[in-house]
Design a protein with these regions (language model features):
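Long, contiguous, structured domain-core segments that constitute the functional module of a protein
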Residues: 115-270, 274, 334
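C-terminal accessory domains/tails appended to large, multi-domain proteins
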Residues: 36-40, 218, 222, 231-235, ...
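Short, hydrophobic/π-rich interface segment
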Residues: 270-290, 294-296
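Generic beta-strand/beta-sheet core signal
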Residues: 44-46, 214-217, 308, 322-324
Length: 348
């Protein structure tokens, strides 16, 4: 569709798979990243707990440091994949979330016959789990439907929630009632930051509720570090999916626009002015005061277009687009200073 005249490009690719660091999976992810990069459509899929040397996500709280797991020799090909240029088009979501209530008279009755689905015991495999990639896909499509852009896909207040999850209550051994975590395991803030640092997109359950959220939307790519702080900052932005989705959408439009202009009598300056005026429609020039809804529809804080002639090839031009998106809050360091007045000893 992307390379077809009149075609409608795909915005994203979603795969119902779970990948780990095995050689076949790394090779397949590498090839999929090339397809996603060529079509400017990020590939969203799931991560397998075996990627972290675990049998299930319920063991996620056990390792003290997740980063050390990826420093062993068996992860050499995985590290190479994360350092590749096209890996920014890969997104691995985890853990799984509950797809439905267990069948039963009090949870989800079956009209045709009496059936009680057995979910007793500690075996979480008795439940119906869904790939977390579908949760991210839901946020992507919702953002596109409401704003025309796939930028509001993360955070509790900015489109990252997955609502109305099944909340199955079960009796405990001590006679109480507990709720099955709808995301396999509750993930702490510290562990969420570790997972994001290692290229994962964790789905975090809000305790005692039927809601979970993607706090971050980090791609699989490991951002490169440079001596120049600005270059390092650009690498960090390029590895985050909200900014990548905005850039990909511009790439889709540009190919169609330039294709329609082939054969028209345009000088270099005319083409540059026309493209600059077009892209200014998506720049929020009042970013300091505009609400979040305006930023979602106009995802750029600044944009500049440069068109240059190709030497030795009349009628051909090369263009450069400099895009600066609205920055999203990634974290906040808090310092506290406590002041206490102590009673002084009175002179006798």
């Amino acid at each position: 569709e992307y390379g077809q005249f009149g075609g409608e490009p795909y915005g994203a690719l979603v795969g119902d798979y779970h990948f780990d660091h095995s050689p076949p999976d790394v090779e397949l992810l590498g090839e999929m990243s090339k397809v996603a990069a060529a079509s400017h459509a990020p590939f969203i899929t799931g991560a397998n707990p075996t990627l972290f040397q675990m049998d299930s996500w319920s063991e996620l709280a056990n390792p003290r440091d997740l980063t050390k797991i990826f420093q062993t020799p068996e992860y050499a090909s995985w590290r190479s994949l994360r350092e590749s240029e096209d890996s920014r088009y890969l997104g691995l979501a985890m853990p799984r979330f509950l797809g439905r209530y267990p069948y039963g008279d009090k949870t989800d009755p079956v009209e045709e016959f009496a059936f009680e689905e057995d979910t007793e015991g500690a075996d979480s495999g008795k439940y119906c789990w869904v790939n977390a990639a579908y949760g991210m896909a839901r946020n992507i499509t919702r953002s596109f439907k409401e704003y025309g852009w796939c930028t509001r896909i993360r955070g509790v207040e900015s489109g990252g929630t997955v609502d109305n999850l099944p909340t199955h209550n079960f009796p405990t051994d001590d006679g109480g009632v507990d709720m099955k975590c709808p995301t396999e395991i509750a993930i702490s803030d510290r562990r969420e930051a570790e997972l994001a640092k290692n290229g994962m997109m964790p789905l975090i359950h809000r305790k005692n509720s039927d809601m979970a959220a993607f706090i971050g939307a980090q791609s699989l790519q490991k951002p490169a570090e440079y001596d120049d702080p600005d270059a390092t900052a650009n690498a960090n932005l390029a590895a985050r999916l909200p900014y990548l989705f905005a850039t990909c959408r511009f790439a889709h439009y540009l190919k169609c626009i330039v294709r329609d202009k082939v054969g028209s009598f345009k000088e270099r300056q005319d083409m540059q002015d026309w493209l600059q005026n077009w892209i200014n429609n998506y720049v929020d020039f009042n970013a300091d005061t505009s609400p979040e809804e305006v930023k979602a529809r106009q995802p750029l804080a600044a944009a500049e277009v440069q068109v240059e002639e190709v030497e030795g090839n009349p009628g051909y031009y090369s263009s450069k687009f400099f895009l600066r998106p609205h920055y999203q809050l990634e974290g906040l360091s808090v310092s506290l200073r406590l002041v206490s007045k102590l009673p002084s000893q009175k002179a006798g």
